[in-house]
Amino acid sequence: MKILAVVGSPRLKGNINYLADQALEEAQELGAETEKIVLSQYEVNPCLGHDDCASFESCLQKDDAGWILDRFREADGVILVTPVYWYNVSAQMKAFIDRNYFLYKHDQKYKARVVGIIVVAEMEAIEDTLHTLKQFIDWSFDVEEDRIFIACGYAHKMGDAKKNLPLVEDARKLGKQMVESLRERS
């Protein structure tokens, strides 16, 4: 079983990356193969909105999004990980979500059987961010509601997530729940 985390934070040592690592570490300890893709380390251009993808099997832009989306297709479980920036997902995560437009145009869905969401905010807008991610999940995955696992909370400065033990535990629990869910329905 393979679980892939896609991280929308540009901070490699920030709170959200730390929590993604916690979830993946727990999943790995339970036997899952894990991978983490930090979007800021790749070239993922924004959607150009030209609608040409309706005529093709994938986006015509030649950047790293195609490779990342292929990894997404192969995963049994996916974790969407983002900080809240200006009341919603980060720009990196938004660009990635928008590049999935071709799925909608071709009435396709990813095969992942479980999805996790990790969101960290400084002080507010977690609900708005969750709404955006759930909308993406609804359009892009054929996953039942009880197979979507969420860990979210608050952390202001770099390193604050490590001190927020309930949030760390929630991230680890998310990794565990994903593995258990994949095992029980395989």
Task: Tell me the role of every PLM-derived stretch.
Residues 1-106, 150, 159-186:
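N-terminal beta1-alpha1-beta2 submodule of the flavodoxin-like/Rossmannoid cofactor-binding fold
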Residues 92, 105-151:
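Short, glycine-/small-residue-rich phosphate/pyrophosphate-handling segment
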Residues 155-156:
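Active-site rim beta-loop-alpha module in soluble metabolic enzymes
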